[in-house]
């Protein structure tokens, strides 16, 4: 049973990494068009990826994972703009 759980966790880890590899450039470009400072855009990207990680159970079943990530980035950009 423990081995199966470990294998499932490893599969989830690999799937999450694949999703991020496939979408990181898209997300960064999306953010960079709205936040011109590269350092701040990287911060927003990292916050977006952190939320994706925290919500992985929801995200892995989502029918439009890229859309989920972009919407998350959009909300993080709004948060950023409220602070400035």
Predicted regions and their residues:
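Intrinsically disordered, low-complexity regions enriched in small/polar residues
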Residues: 18, 30-32, 52-55, 70, ...
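Structural recognition of an alpha-helix C-terminal capping motif at a helix-to-coil junction
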Residues: 29, 43-50, 63-75
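A short, charge-rich alpha-helical start-of-domain segment used by transcription regulators
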Residues: 3-29, 33, 42
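Arg/Lys-rich amphipathic alpha helix in sigma70-family domain 2
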Residues: 74-84
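Short, low-complexity, intrinsically disordered N-terminal modules
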Residues: 2-3, 77
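Sigma70-family region 2
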Residues: 9, 49-64, 83-84
